[in-house]
From Swiss-Prot:
DNA-binding interval(s): 28-48
SUPFAM superfamilies for the chain: LexA/Signal peptidase, Winged helix' DNA-binding domain
Keyword presence, Cell cycle: no
Keyword Transport: no
Domain of life from the UniProt record: Bacteria
Pfam family, one: LexA_DNA_bind
Gene Ontology molecular-function annotations: DNA binding; serine-type endopeptidase activity
UniProt-recorded name of the protein: LexA repressor
Function: Represses a number of genes involved in the response to DNA damage (SOS response), including recA and lexA. In the presence of single-stranded DNA, RecA interacts with LexA causing an autocatalytic cleavage which disrupts the DNA-binding part of LexA, leading to derepression of the SOS regulon and eventually DNA repair.
Native source organism of the sequence: Staphylococcus aureus (strain Mu3 / ATCC 700698)
Enzyme class: hydrolase
Amino acid sequence: MRELTKRQSEIYNYIKQVVQMKGYPPSVREIGEAVGLASSSTVHGHLSRLEEKGYIRRDPTKPRAIEIVSDQTNDNINMEETIHVPVIGKVTAGVPITAVENIEEYFPLPEHLTSTHNSDIFILNVVGDSMIEAGILDGDKVIVRSQTIAENGDIIVAMTEEDEATVKRFYKEKNRYRLQPENSTMEPIYLDNVAVIGKVIGLYREM
């Protein structure tokens, strides 16, 4: 394989390090921040050189789709299979706001975090602190499996009677539904009707 420049080596080694730690590659922005490059076009240029020299492979149709090419000169790398999951608007964990019902981006997740059919999975960004006692914090990404039913105690994404989306713990009571926040300073939401969008099956948090 052709020799790398100092900057190309820095980028290549950073990509390998992130893959080894997280199981998936960094974004262009993260690469730039790590090696001190403010211009994303400059980072793209270095990635193109790495690809031309046979160190990486990329899929231009997907974000973060950088694959380390192994050969005799490279360390063995265990890169976990990733899937690209749609990120759909934002869901309020607090005062509900109307969810944006379109795909904002696709986010790569290690396959083990989904544990179900990939086509049924989507991600929502959490806004607010009503679920903090369940370990769901403002800015987290909740991994959601699409489904329209729920059992008491499930953490769900629901549409309220005002067509607003929210993350809460679900309870069906005698004549109503209770959407219970996991924050002792907040009151539950009581509804005559509630539409379950999906069940929260996982959580992703960037450290």
